[in-house]
From Swiss-Prot:
Top enzyme category: hydrolase
Function: Catalyzes the conversion of GTP to 2,5-diamino-6-ribosylamino-4(3H)-pyrimidinone 5'-phosphate (DARP), formate and pyrophosphate.
Gene name as annotated: ribA
GO cellular component terms, semicolon-separated: cytosol
Keywords from the UniProt entry: GTP-binding, Hydrolase, Metal-binding, Nucleotide-binding, Riboflavin biosynthesis, Zinc
Recorded metabolic or biological pathway in which this protein acts: Cofactor biosynthesis; riboflavin biosynthesis; 5-amino-6-(D-ribitylamino)uracil from GTP: step 1/4
Gene3D superfamilies for this protein: GTP cyclohydrolase II
Cofactor note: Binds 1 zinc ion per subunit.
Name recorded for this polypeptide: GTP cyclohydrolase-2
Domain of life of the source: Bacteria
InterPro entries: GTP_cyclohydro_II, RibA, RibA-like_sf
Length: 202
């Protein structure tokens, strides 16, 4: 896959100052990578692969855990003194924003997150991670510590020839609105959920 680096800039945030790098696929799809600290290629890099979630990341939705995970991942990277966030433009697990709204409507009517996708004619998860290899290669990184609950992300990187030396769960944001969503991700999509995430809210 051809993924080209375009440009970079400083990105000051309330957590600290990151460097933001822009990448574009041949298809025109854009992705960004935020780095913090000095990237040393011979050292496993703490990273998060985060797929775009407008509702969670920008609109503070409590229907998912995405926004909570984004914030926590950046905090962990800053605390570690070094790391990167790959922000991938594949909204709604790859089905797009409008279809995500349709899926949410179906969930309002009783479907779970997997059933909603299937009723719309989609697989439960259409995301891909092939763009991550050239993005990481831009920094000569081939060993990572991955912040994720999703074993498919671990396997995807391994399939790309990237060594995942550690999977670090990022279990945050459980609330009354996303409790069943998190249950479904654990039970039907294989996500790691512990610390009472599967217990009843009390």
């Amino acid at each position: 896959m051809s993924v080209n680096f375009v440009d970079s800039c400083r990105l000051p945030t309330h957590l600290g100052e990151f460097e933001m790098y822009g990448f574009v696929e041949e298809s025109g799809q854009e992705h960004i990578m935020l780095t913090y600290g000095e990237i040393t290629p011979d050292k496993p890099l703490l990273i998060r692969l985060h797929s775009e979630c407008l509702t969670g990341d920008s609109l503070f939705s409590m229907r998912c855990d995405c926004g909570y995970q984004l914030e926590t991942a950046l905090e962990n990277i800053v605390d570690a003194g070094q790391g990167a966030l790959l922000y991938l433009r594949q909204e709604g697990r790859g089905i797009g924003l409008i279809n995500k709204i349709k899926a949410y409507h179906l969930q309002d009517d009783g479907a779970d997150t997997v059933e909603a996708n299937e009723q719309l004619g989609f697989a439960a998860d259409l995301r891909r991670y092939t763009m991550c290899k050239p993005m990481l290669e831009h920094f000569r990184v081939n060993k990572v510590k991955l912040l994720t609950n999703n074993p498919k992300k671990v396997q995807a990187l391994k399939d790309l020839g990237i060594e995942v030396v550690e999977q670090m769960p990022i279990q945050v944001g459980r609330n009354q609105y996303n409790h069943e969503y998190l249950n479904t991700k654990a039970e039907r999509m294989g996500h790691m959920m512990t610390h009472g995430l599967l217990s009843d809210l009390g």
